[in-house]
């Protein structure tokens, strides 16, 4: 259980997806603070700005203009004060290549964007309530891609 | 080097020859000596004979004088005195001859001296006899004395002459005996020596003719093989050259000239001509390689272009090796290949490969479009529909609710189609990594993937033991999912589905029409169900993409599932067949190579 509101950051260029995401967080009963960036450049600027509080979980779309999600991921993992942020890849693609690449680059979980709003809520709930310390230590290729029971 | 026959006999032949020649030389020297000896002995005989004659002449001259004197004394006719007058000269002539003949013989000289003294005394006695027989000075007693003395002198002369003759004879005998001894030793010896030499020569003649026969045979073989080599060189478009590093001589095979576009033996090759026809681009590298041969005594493959006199460019590949022949000279054996055809084919293949790569890339980008860009709007349609809450639906008209449901099912169908198409194209394009896994494991994975529907339909799946095979694991798992899923989907409405899966090993020769014959053994995996089955006339068409036997309202599906199965099995060089009896069930048989 979290004492303070979780700080969530979504990097996604798609307006509709940001809307779904926002609505889903509003409907689940967990206290969260959700903010958005629209592309990779904006994301990196946001993270590098010391005035901004670092997110607890970053939801990262792969297919973004200016700087792709993969580039951001690599950059984040190379930066000392950012590398411990929990990163959930949040993408339409479910290609083996993307899953493999992001796993190797150190993302914590891979979420394929669902096509049902209720499923989205379930996924967000799952990701937010997971004990990340426990999950990260047991992370492997099989449980990297999030599958809802 | 094995291909040069070894004539060991040549050395022993040489020895035999030398021996035979020496024997013959020896024999001829003996013959020469014999000849000399014979000559010597005949000269000796002549010598003795001459002395003998001269002595006889001397004797007869004195006798003539004696007879003439006697006749004169008796008759007092001066004509009887003529032989007496001449005898003195005759004696002197013979004496000079004898002196010459016995010049090398001291005892005979002394004898001759004594004889001369005796003869002189005899002539003095003649004078005395004539003096005392003359009527003017006649003295019977003195005449008798001198006549008698003359007689004794005569006896002495005869004795001396005989002695001299004897000495000569003895000497002759002695010499002849020595020669005889020398000669009598040899005939048997020389004949046997001659026979030995003859047999040696015969022996070597036999050996020579035998070697000659062998040489002829090898020569014939060499001719045949060199003919074959030059024939195969022109058939195989390769050529050979030999570079004698010691004498720096280079030999080209006939085909080498032909490969260069020239008549055979049209020039005498040397180190410079090796480079003459090489394309200017490659001259430097080939020259370097040639220098490398001398250092490393070896030539790794060199690829280069040559320009023929008619300016046609050909592609060459050259290799070489240093060999040492029987005489110990170092020869670099080089082989040139004209690889122009292969090279051009290679270029063509490379171009085709590039085209293939390009089209593969296009396919991959199409996949990306399908997986990402096409799904994006679809996903949004579905999400927005899911956001239409039940409360929203309450206020909607019946027809509006109906449209929403229809949009929902169409969108769902679109998603299934896209997913299946993606799956189908991925069975082609994704990397095919073969790993040895247990098929039983893959099957149980497939079952757990289908657990929901299996439970829902209360299906029973019976599996016999499946082998461990080298396969692309996720594809075979997909194959099992599709086949079992298919059976579950087309089960009979009132009967609980039963699927039995069995496996056996078969020989490809038992299925000559459908199986790859280069692979000997296959695993035949049979999926038998008790479902509704299909008309056997469709047993081929059901594997074709988008072919459906049922309406999509009764059985939702894309018509891709079995096409994927076929693709997967083909990826494994296997085969899949289907058979069915309508209303009784279907059998799908998968053949996978061992």
Where are these regions (language model features)?
Chain A
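Short, glycine/charged-rich "phosphate-handling" switch motifs in NTP-dependent
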Residues: 108
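Acidic, metal-coordinating helix/loop segments flanking the phosphotransfer/catalytic sites
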Residues: 36-57
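Conserved acidic segment of CheY-like receiver
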Residues: 5-26, 58
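Active-site residues of response regulator receiver
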Residues: 60-61, 91
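CheY-like receiver
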Residues: 119, 124-125, 129-149
């Amino acid at each position: 259980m979290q004492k303070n509101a979780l700080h969530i950051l979504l990097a996604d260029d798609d307006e509709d997806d940001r809307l779904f995401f926002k609505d889903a967080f509003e409907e689940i009963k967990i206290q969260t603070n959700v903010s958005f960036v629209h592309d990779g450049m904006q994301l990196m600027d946001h993270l590098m700005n010391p005035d901004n509080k670092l997110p607890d979980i970053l939801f990262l779309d792969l297919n973004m203009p200016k700087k792709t999600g993969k580039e951001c991921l690599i950059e984040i993992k190379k930066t000392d004060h950012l590398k411990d942020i929990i990163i959930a890849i949040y993408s339409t693609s479910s290609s083996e290549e993307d899953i493999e690449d992001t796993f190797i680059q150190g993302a914590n979980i891979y979420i394929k964007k669902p096509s049902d709003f209720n499923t989205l809520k379930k996924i967000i709930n799952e990701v937010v309530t997971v004990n990340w310390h426990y999950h990260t230590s047991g992370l492997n290729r099989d449980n990297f891609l999030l599958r809802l029971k | 080097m094995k291909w040069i026959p070894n004539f060991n006999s040549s050395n022993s032949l040489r020895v035999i020859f030398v021996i035979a020649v020496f024997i013959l030389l020896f024999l001829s020297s003996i013959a020469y000596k014999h000849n000399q000896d014979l000559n010597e002995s005949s000269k000796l005989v002549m010598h003795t004979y001459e002395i003998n004659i001269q002595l006889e002449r001397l004797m007869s001259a004195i006798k003539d004088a004696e007879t003439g004197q006697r006749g004169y004394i008796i008759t007092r006719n001066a004509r009887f005195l003529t032989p007496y007058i001449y005898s003195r000269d005759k004696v002197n002539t013979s004496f000079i001859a004898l002196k010459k003949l016995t010049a090398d013989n001291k005892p005979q000289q002394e004898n001759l001296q004594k004889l001369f003294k005796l003869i002189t005394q005899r002539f003095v006695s003649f004078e005395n006899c004539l003096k005392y027989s003359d009527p003017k000075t006649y003295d019977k007693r003195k005449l008798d004395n001198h006549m008698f003395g003359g007689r004794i002198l005569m006896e002495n002369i005869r004795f001396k002459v005989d002695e001299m003759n004897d000495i000569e004879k003895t000497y002759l005998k002695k010499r002849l005996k020595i020669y005889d001894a020398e000669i009598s030793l040899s005939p048997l010896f020389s004949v046997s020596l001659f026979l030995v030499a003859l047999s040696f020569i015969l022996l070597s003649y036999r050996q020579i003719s035998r070697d000659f026969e062998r040489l002829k045979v090898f020569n014939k073989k060499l001719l045949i093989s060199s003919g074959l080599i030059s024939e195969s060189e022109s058939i195989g478009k390769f050529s050979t050259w030999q570079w004698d590093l010691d004498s720096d001589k280079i030999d080209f095979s006939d085909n080498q000239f032909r490969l260069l576009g020239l008549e055979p033996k049209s020039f005498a090759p040397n180190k410079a001509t090796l480079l003459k026809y090489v394309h200017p681009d490659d001259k430097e590298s080939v020259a370097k390689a040639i220098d490398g041969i001398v250092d490393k005594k070896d030539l790794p493959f060199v690829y280069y272009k040559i320009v023929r006199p008619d300016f046609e460019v050909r592609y060459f590949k050259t290799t070489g090796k240093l060999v040492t022949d029987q005489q110990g000279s170092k020869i670099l054996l080089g082989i040139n290949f004209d690889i122009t055809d292969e090279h051009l084919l290679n270029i063509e293949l490379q171009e085709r490969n590039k085209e293939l790569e390009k089209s593969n890339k296009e396919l991959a980008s199409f996949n990306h479009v399908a997986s990402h860009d096409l799904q994006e709007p679809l996903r949004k349609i579905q999400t927005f529909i899911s956001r239409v809450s039940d409360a929203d639906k309450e206020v909607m008209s019946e027809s509006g609710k109906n449209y929403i449901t229809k949009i929902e099912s169409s969108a769902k169908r679109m998603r299934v189609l896209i997913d299946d198409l993606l799956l189908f194209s991925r069975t082609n394009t994704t990397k095919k990594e073969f790993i040895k896994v247990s098929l039983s494991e893959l099957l149980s994975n497939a079952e757990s993937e289908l657990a929901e529907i299996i439970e829902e339909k209360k299906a029973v799946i019976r599996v016999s033991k499946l082998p461990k095979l080298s396969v692309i694991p996720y594809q075979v798992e997909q194959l099992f999912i599709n086949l079992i899923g298919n059976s579950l989907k087309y089960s009979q409405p009132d009967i609980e589905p039963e699927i039995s899966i069995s496996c056996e090993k078969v020989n490809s020769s038992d299925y000559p029409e459908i199986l790859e014959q280069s692979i000997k053994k296959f695993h035949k995996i049979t999926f038998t169900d008790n479902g509704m089955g299909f008309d056997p006339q469709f047993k081929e068409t059901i594997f074709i993409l988008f072919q459906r036997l049922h309406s999509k309202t009764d059985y939702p599906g894309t018509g891709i599932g079995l096409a994927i199965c076929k693709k997967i099995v083909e990826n494994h060089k296997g085969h899949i067949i289907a058979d069915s009896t309508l209303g009784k069930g279907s059998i799908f048989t998968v053949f996978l190579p061992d």
